[in-house]
Amino acid sequence: VQLPLPKHINPQNIYIPDAVDVDGFNSTSPFQPCTPLGVMKIFDSIGYDLDGKNVLACGQSDIVGRPLVDMLIKRHCNVISVNSSGNALRYYALHDGLVDVVISAVGERDFISPLDLFNVDVCIDVGINYDENGKQHGDCADAVYNMKDIKVTPRIGGVGLMTRAMLLYNVCVAKYGEHKMEEVIG
């Protein structure tokens, strides 16, 4: 079920059979979760080889954080996974230059600052939150998006577009099968 739902609907009370769970939200779904899959496709599209890289994954939700960590491990990454309160571990990992990639999906404005990105190659901002005026922000501070020495996904028009593209991909896989889709898109 696409979240968020209206407050009067409890997502736990809605049943989607695994065979049609194209969002990949259920752990037994045959489909990969759309947002983590979209993040992995971003790495593919920029030609960034994750093999052996040190990745800091911020956020441990069932929909994004945990499936993303699993996908990163399958790509032979060394993953440090923290939640939004994992500041000490995050600090030491980032400031000791141990991290090649930062992926933040905590939904907290300014969670990642330019000072956090010392020696980082790529920063993927998955988080979404809104200020008191309703303006959308990511997890990265505004100054991060202006950094020239690393690749940073845009806060608008970045991971969200990839999530929707992967949802469409999963729908096509449901209809035609994964082998046919691989033939079509390569």
Regions found by a protein language model. Give the residues of each.
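General beta-strand structural signal in soluble alpha/beta enzymes
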Residues: V1, G24-S27, Q32, L50, ...
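Generic secondary-structure signature for well-ordered alpha-helical cores
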Residues: V1, I16-D21, D44-Y48, I73, ...
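Glycine/serine-rich phosphate-binding loop and adjoining beta1-alpha1 elements at the start
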Residues: V1-S45
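Rossmann-fold NAD(P)-binding glycine/threonine-rich loop
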Residues: H8-G24, I124-M181
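Short capping/connector residues at structural and topological boundaries
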Residues: P30, V55, R164-L167
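Glycine-rich phosphate/diphosphate-binding loop of Rossmann-like nucleotide-binding domains
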Residues: P33-V126, D131, K135-Q136, C140-Y145
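Short alpha-helical "patches" and their helix-cap loops
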Residues: G52-G59, E178-G186
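Conserved catalytic alpha/beta core of Sir2/sirtuin-type deacylases, generalized to analogous enzyme cores
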Residues: G86, M166, E182-G186
